[in-house]
Amino acid sequence: MPSPDILRTEALRCVWPDGTLALDGVDLSIRAGQVTALLGSNGAGKSSLLLSFNGILKPQSGRVLLLDEPLDYSARGLKALRQKVGIVFQNPDAQLFASSVYEDISFGLCNLGLPEPETRRRIEAAMELVGVSALARKPVHHLSFGQKKRVALAGVLAMEPSVLLLDEPTAGLDPQGADAIMRFIRELQRSRGMTVVVATHDIEMAPLFCDRVCIMERGRVLFEGEISAIVEHRDLVRQAGLRLPRIAHLIEILVSKDGFTLPGNVMTIGAARKVLKTLKENQKSDERR
C-alpha cells in the first residue's frame, strides 16, 4: 500500500509582498518516509513551496496540511511546526550567525526549554551525524561553503524533525561534495524513516536519490508521481524548462533515430549498464544458434 501523506497542499496560492505570484493553485501530496524531488527551472516556485511547508510563506488562499491538520500560523503554532518540519536554505549563510559551530547548532534547541543534558546530547549527535564534530569550536565564518552546508543541516537535524526540507542542497558544491551530501540524505531517510523534500533543477540527481517527483513551472504543478515516470512525461519535463537525464536522452535518440529496441525508463548509468549487458548476452545466445 502507498505511504500516507504527511504534507499536503490544497489549491495553495501565495503572493510575495511585491505582488509576485509565487504559487498558483498548487495541489500536492508528500508521502511519508520518502524522498520527493521538486523539479523546475529558476522561478518555478520550488523554494516558495518549501517556505510554505515551513510556515514562512503564508498563503493568500488554499491551505497546507501536516498530518491532515491545517497549519496554525500563530506564534505557538509556528514554533511547534518548525520542530516537526525543518528547512535548510540554499545559501547556508542565511541561517548561520553564531560565533562558533557549536553555538550555531544549539540556537534552535535553546528556545525549546530542554534540559541541558538533552540539549548537549542532541548537538553532539547532530555534529557526529554530519561529520563536523572536529569543527565544534571553529568560527562559522572560517568554514568552507561545504562545511557551512553541513553545519546548517546539523542545526536542523538537532531539532529532530520528522520532515526535512532542502533547497538546492548540492548548489555550490563540487561533484564529490554533492554526491556525498545526497548519499548522506538518502541514508538518513532510509535509517530513520524521515520524509525529505528536495528542491532542485538537477535532474541527473533525482533518479539516483529520490522516490517521487513533482515537476513545477511558474508556480504550478505539471506532474506529480513516481520518479520512474519522468521519461513517460518528457514533454512536461521540457515544458518546465528542463531536459531528460543524459542517459534517458541517449536512450531516446537510440530508439527514435537509430532503430534500437530498448526500455524507455532507463535514466541512470547503472540501469543502462544492465540493459547493455542483457543485449550482449542475447547477442551471444543468437550467435550460438
Swiss-Prot record:
Gene3D superfamilies: P-loop containing nucleotide triphosphate hydrolases. InterPro entries: AAA+_ATPase, ABC_transporter-like_ATP-bd, ABC_transporter-like_CS, ABC_transpr_CbiO/EcfA_su, Co_trans_ATP-bd, ECF_ABC_transporter_ATP-bd, P-loop_NTPase. One of its GO terms (molecular function) is ATP hydrolysis activity. Residues 7-243 form the ABC transporter domain. SUPFAM superfamilies: P-loop containing nucleoside triphosphate hydrolases. SMART domains: AAA. GO terms for biological process: cobalt ion transport. Its EC number is 7.-.-.-. It holds the Pfam family ABC_tran. Keywords: ATP-binding, Cell inner membrane, Cell membrane, Membrane, Nucleotide-binding, Translocase, Transport. PROSITE patterns: ABC_TRANSPORTER_1, ABC_TRANSPORTER_2. ATP binds at residues 40-47. GO terms for cellular component: ATP-binding cassette (ABC) transporter complex. Transmembrane segments: none annotated. It is found in: Cell inner membrane. Signal peptide: none annotated. It is a peripheral membrane protein. CDD domains: ABC_cobalt_CbiO_domain1. PANTHER family: ENERGY-COUPLING FACTOR TRANSPORTER ATP-BINDING PROTEIN ECFA1, HEAVY METAL TRANSPORTER. Belongs to the ABC transporter superfamily. Probably part of an ABC transporter complex. Responsible for energy coupling to the transport system. This is Putative ABC transporter ATP-binding protein CT0391. It comes from Chlorobaculum tepidum (strain ATCC 49652 / DSM 12025 / NBRC 103806 / TLS).
